[in-house]
Each structure stands twice: as structure tokens, then as C-alpha cells.
């Protein structure tokens, strides 16, 4: 998975949507969910790498007992790490920002594709955290999910820029 910043901390691509933009602006959520719908394919197909496997081996040997990560992709758990603290959350679960209802991300993909078939056909370059590089689109027709319980805003359980831990 690509990262947002280079080794010197400089942005490598356009800055992602902030928590404040996501919460305040419907069009920001439309942009987010259209890009996330396209980029989700990359998240589902991502596999743990040698570094993930090495950390599992260190855990099995008792060298480490807990892993704290800023990664939001769940690859440490998929590799077999058992005691993982996802400091920045996970993108494979969602929460309603009004009532706290929890949702798995995978079924939402089907909903997004069913309600937005014109976006489902798009191809985009891989970007961090389930995002895709598909700028210069009109997102105004993108149907986005609301909480099935209260109608509130649904957001991935990951820290966005400007969000709090």
C-alpha cells in the first residue's frame, strides 16, 4: 500500500479529505466514497508482506508481545499477529457518527456499486488507505450511504487528517 508522505514527511499526492471536510460537506463525502469505492479493490487484494511475516515470527518467539501500528489496513492481523493496537483505526469497519452503530466495510461495497454503477466501472491508480487516484470527476451524482439505524453520517473507523486519536 502506498503512503501519504515520503521519507522527509512531504506529501506525495493530493492531501486526503480531512475529518472536518468529511463531516461538514456532502460533496466531500461524495468525493471520498467514490474514490474509496474504486480503491477498495486494492485493499481487499492486498497481502501481508515479508515485514508483516517477520513480526509474526518475533511474536511467536516471544520477542515482542504487542504491536502498535499506524496502518489501517488490517494486514498485521491477516499475517497472524494476535495482539495489535491499531492506533489510527481500521478502514474495514465503519461507524455512524451520530448513533455509533457499527458496520463492516465489505457489504457496503456491494451497496455502493449497486447504487453507483457508473463509478463502479472506473479504474484508478492505487492510493493510500483504500483511496484511488480518480480526480477530475463530477461526484455530484454519487449516492452515499447513511446509517440504516438513524440516517447519520457513516465514516470508516480510521483517523482522518484533522481527526483525534
Question: Residue spans of the language-model regions?
Answer:
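Conserved catalytic core of sirtuin-type NAD+-dependent deacylases
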Residues: 1-165
